Amino acid sequence: TDYLTYKSKSEVKNVFDDASKMGLKVIRIWGNLDVGKKTGEIDSQSGHETFEGNNDGTGEKDGVYFQYWDDEAGKPVVNEGEDGLRHLDYIIKQAEEHDMKLVITFTNYWEAFGGMGQYVKWYQMSQGKSVGNSKVDEKDTCDFYTNETIKSWYKDYIKTLLNHTNYYTGEKLMDSEAVFSWELSNEPRCTVDEFCKDDILYNWAKEMSAYVKSIDPYHMVSVGDEGFYNLGYQEAARQDLPSSAYSGYYGVDFDKLMTIDTVDFGTPHMYVDQWGFDLGDDDLEWIKRHAQTTS
């Protein structure tokens, strides 16, 4: 439900009303909406601020943005105002009023809402590079896991978000009864080849999950990965398993990630068509294997 992050109060309330009637107890939402730097111009049609250097091409969503690049500060700055984190505040308020819980993500591997690539673009801006409104390539995206400056910005955002005071409730976000867990990213991956080794994501997840716990030890933390395994190409073939999901190609090792003390649960996804799964065989094996890994 990524659209909750930027939609109107009435739309957000309607979603929670409907979800409550359906008996839903937990909703996952995006806790990030990152854009480039302000152009100083207003869009004549929408009346919204405009930005340049957006990783997803468009930047703000309905005028809402959570982080943007500030040339004067020389770093990304958090927008805690009416068109910023106050949107998240209202979502949390509605969750509390409907007795529901939220899984809140900190970033996204994909370009939607800026994601990891926006951090990379911010770093490029800090180095005086000219950046356009298009997503960065995969090689540069993987710098998100290893560049120390980028990692410090990511940690700064986490610290600000968890300590942010909700405009409507007066509580820090991390003290809200609506928080079920924090998620490091939506679907983090780092394709293994000459620029990304299979321990990069593990090391990043270990460091960042520990950092979250150092601020908020009372809520669960998940990595947010899709649950890929790292059996190797030969072993995946020997077991007649879909290579993309089991070989380790995406730089994710679900078995290893589940050994991190500061990671509380796994988040396997399943895209049957995209991953070449056979219905009834591969999908059931995927579910059973993850259940076994986390048991």
Residue map of PLM features:
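Short, charge-rich amphipathic segments
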Residues: 1, 81-91, 133-145, 252
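Active-site-adjacent substrate/metal-binding segments within catalytic domains
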Residues: 1-114, 159-160, 265
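Soluble non-cytosolic domains of exported or imported proteins
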Residues: 6-10, 79-86, 144, 148, ...
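Detector for Asparagine
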Residues: 14, 32, 54-55, 79, ...
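Alpha-helix termination/capping residues and helix-transition junctions
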Residues: 21-23, 97, 173-176, 259-260
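Low-complexity, flexible helical/coil segments
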Residues: 29-30, 74-75, 140-148
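Aromatic- and acidic-residue-enriched segments that line the glycan-binding/catalytic groove
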Residues: 39-68, 79, 97, 107-143, ...
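Extracellular glycoside hydrolase catalytic/binding regions
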Residues: 142-146, 152, 156-174, 181-295
